[in-house]
């Protein structure tokens, strides 16, 4: 007596692979009697429950019975025995091909799920800024100093943030960071670079602030200066500060 559990399968080959894995059958040496019996049990169970059976399942059932019958025929000892075609060969080839296809599909689905954990931002159109007058940067600090300051902020922030971070769809934009800098400069003509941070920001917010400062500096909205190496970095209003506000 057999216990049959009806699962959802994507066609007869999917059902055969399920049975092969369930009963730990060697796909290269399939015992046709056992596999055919299990397959037919599934077909009979569907009929008993009055479930419509797709014609492709019945076609494969006929094929299994034919292969089983051929394997039961007596084998005559001849010099050509080694060249006799195994009646299972075509079925095995199709099963292996389907198995490879299924594994590759699962792999692609995993990649898709991983990609869905990331959120992309489309490039910002800055073409309207091309005509804005740029300012003389002869007294600006070296970009290396600004990058070093960014690294110090990131290092200090890492001690105040949890190791596990929940991904949220709400992102901190360059426009928001630029607005914060502009609002601080509206109150004071000069602000300290490090005053922009609470050191509780996540990496995304730090990077966004950094990119906003670079963009504002490039377009002359702010000016960045440093009295000497490793000293505080000061941000002041640039020649284009307030234009278009």
UniProtKB/Swiss-Prot annotation:
It comes from the Bacteria. Belongs to the ScpA family. Transmembrane segments: none annotated. Participates in chromosomal partition during cell division. May act via the formation of a condensin-like complex containing Smc and ScpB that pull DNA away from mid-cell into both cell halves. This is Segregation and condensation protein A. Component of a cohesin-like complex composed of ScpA, ScpB and the Smc homodimer, in which ScpA and ScpB bind to the head domain of Smc. The presence of the three proteins is required for the association of the complex with DNA. The gene is scpA. InterPro entries: ScpA (IPR003768), ScpA-like_C (IPR023093). Keywords: Cell cycle, Cell division, Chromosome partition, Cytoplasm. It is found in: Cytoplasm. Its main location: cytoplasm. The lineage of its organism: Bacteria, Bacillati, Bacillota, Bacilli, Bacillales. GO terms for biological process: cell division; chromosome segregation; DNA replication. GO terms for cellular component: cytoplasm. It holds the Pfam family SMC_ScpA. It comes from Staphylococcus carnosus (strain TM300).
